[in-house]
Amino acid sequence: MKLLSKIMIIALAASMLQACNGPGGMNKQGTGTLLGGAGGALLGSQFGQGKGQLVGVGVGALLGAVLGGQIGAGMDEQDRRLAELTSQRALETAPSGSNVEWRNPDNGNYGYVTPNKTYRNSTGQYCREYTQTVVIGGKQQKAYGNACLQPDGQ
């Protein structure tokens, strides 16, 4: 399945779960946990085969949920949008080891993405390791990940 299709399914599932949460919807921490878990599962599914891939999905989902919940507790929609756009730009165009920053002038939250090693995985996809750092309310948190291009360039 293409990465874009997976992302759309995750977004749809997240919005449906928010609707089930009652008046006011899910809070930022709940949304962060849900999206972090889904994103972690998606990243974990890129590694291994058979049972190894299932382990990757499980570990990715767990780590993503924990980190997503912590980060989501303090990030608002504008923070998430800025972080997402910055991540995409950093992974596509920035040299390894450089920081690509974002800053929300409304609340002072900020962060940066540091793209690292570029490599080809076992299925021939081009992938890139990265570090994402966010500072929310003066508290810094880091996440590490890998992002891979799909055959269609997405």
UniProtKB/Swiss-Prot annotation:
Source taxon at top rank: Bacteria
Xref: InterPro entries: Anti_2 (IPR032635), Gly_zipper_2TM_dom (IPR008816), Surface_antigen_Rickettsia (IPR016364)
Chief place of localization: membrane
Lipid attachment, kind N-palmitoyl cysteine: 20
A GO CC term assigned to this protein in UniProt: cell outer membrane
Signal sequence range: 1-19
Residues spanning the membrane: none
Protein name according to UniProt: 17 kDa surface antigen
Source organism per UniProt: Rickettsia montanensis
Source organism phylogeny: Bacteria, Pseudomonadati, Pseudomonadota, Alphaproteobacteria, Rickettsiales
